[in-house]
Amino acid sequence: MHRTTRIKITELNPHLMCVLCGGYFIDATTIIECLHSFCKTCIVRYLETSKYCPICDVQVHKTRPLLNIRSDKTLQDIVYKLVPGLFKNEMKRRRDFYAAHPSADAANGSNEDRGEVADEDKRIITDDEIISLSIEFFDQNRLDRKINKDKEKSKEEVNDKRYLRCPAAMTVMHLRKFLRSKMDIPNTFQIDVMYEEEPLKDYYTLMDIAYIYTWRRNGPLPLKYRVRPTCKRMKISHQRDGLTNTGELESDSGSDKANSPAGGIPSTSSCLPSPSTPVQSPHPQFPHISSTMNGTSSSPSGNHQSSFANRPRKSSVNGSSATSSG
């Protein structure tokens, strides 16, 4: 699972700013021929003297370039949601303009054009905004009963719900810590904050939750929580204990091997013969000749030599024959 990376707004600025005025998009407008976007007033003023895109020089239209530009509401909503305070400042500028110029014709414009749209109506949330939320214990059994029975809320369900007012920038991790300290939940239990039946990430802010789940401000943001044992941590601790014990056993056996006479010899079974297997000579044609290892002569034990004790042995050494008896 890939870790989520949070990036700075400055890294997105090239995609959110108009190259003509150097500011963030206001009334974002896109050229349909090349899909480059600009502020509406900026591109309209530019196309009065040119018929080419100011970025890629593609021809917008031969005679009437304004026919090939479109308002981009989606891009403008993204800019308003990403740039803190931009929407509120723009609405204030428009209200101040029409207050200073009463003769300006704004009758055909929308409420947003006149600056009369509040943040709540546009569903724009700022970091310093206070969000009302409700949080209650998530009970699967109660949820099943609620599906099977009537949807009337009992007094017990109402009393289990708590209401909070928190900054929009507060994260789920902060809410989890608050619940743990408020209810004295030990660290051996895990707290999950949920929206409906879906657990939320620790790095989610209340503003993120409101945007992701399209909170309409028609009531407190409904959140739930559940408490469960930290099974994964317990398993990891057991595995570590097992590895530690195994390491201790191996170290103990290693120390025993170091103190034993065979400590310097590898313990691999494929390298050494078993006690019941006779030691094979490196010279199969002369099984009685001992082999030399590390400058010392190693010969079979007395039990293996007894079968050759009374048998004469003849071997050729340096071209001369030698006969030896047991």
UniProtKB/Swiss-Prot annotation:
Which segments carry the region annotation Disordered? 236-326
Sorted alphabetically, the keyword list is:
Chromatin regulator, Cytoplasm, Metal-binding, Nucleus, Proto-oncogene, Repressor, Transcription, Transcription regulation, Ubl conjugation, Zinc, Zinc-finger
Q: Mind telling me which Gene3D superfamilies this protein's record contains? A: Phosphatidylinositol 3-kinase Catalytic Subunit, Chain A, domain 1, Zinc/RING finger domain, C3HC4 (zinc finger)
- Low complexity bias spans: 266-278, 290-303, 315-326
Q: Where are the zinc fingers (RING-type)?
A: 18-57
- GO BP terms in the entry: apoptotic signaling pathway; brain development; chromatin remodeling; DNA methylation-dependent constitutive heterochromatin formation; embryonic skeletal system morphogenesis; hemopoiesis; humoral immune response; in utero embryonic development
Q: Indicate yes or no for the key word Transmembrane helix.
A: no
Q: Describe the processing and modification events after translation.
A: May be polyubiquitinated; which does not lead to proteasomal degradation. Monoubiquitinated.
Per the annotation, the residue ranges of the short sequence motif Nuclear localization signal are 81-95
Could you tell me one molecular function GO term of this UniProt entry? zinc ion binding
Reported induction: Down-regulated by oxidative stress.
CDD domains documented for this protein? RAWUL_PCGF4 (cd17165), RING-HC_PCGF4 (cd16736)
Classify the main location.
Answer: nucleus
Q: Where is this region: Interaction with E4F1?
A: 164-228
- Entry's localization field: Nucleus; Cytoplasm
* Repressor listed as a keyword: yes
State what this protein does.
Answer: Component of a Polycomb group (PcG) multiprotein PRC1-like complex, a complex class required to maintain the transcriptionally repressive state of many genes, including Hox genes, throughout development. PcG PRC1 complex acts via chromatin remodeling and modification of histones; it mediates monoubiquitination of histone H2A 'Lys-119', rendering chromatin heritably changed in its expressibility. The complex composed of RNF2, UB2D3 and BMI1 binds nucleosomes, and has activity only with nucleosomal histone H2A.
What is its quaternary makeup? Component of a PRC1-like complex. Identified in a PRC1-like HPRC-H complex with CBX2, CBX4, CBX8, PHC1, PHC2, PHC3 RING1 and RNF2. Interacts with RNF2/RING2. Interacts with RING1. Part of a complex that contains RNF2, UB2D3 and BMI1, where RNF2 and BMI1 form a tight heterodimer, and UB2D3 interacts only with RNF2. The complex composed of RNF2, UB2D3 and BMI1 binds nucleosomes, and has activity only with nucleosomal histone H2A. Interacts with CBX7 and CBX8. Interacts with SPOP. Part of a complex consisting of BMI1, CUL3 and SPOP. Interacts with E4F1. Interacts with PHC2.
Official protein name in the record: Polycomb complex protein BMI-1
Q: What is the originating organism of this protein?
A: Bos taurus
Source species taxonomy: Eukaryota, Metazoa, Chordata, Craniata, Vertebrata
Gene encoding this chain? BMI1
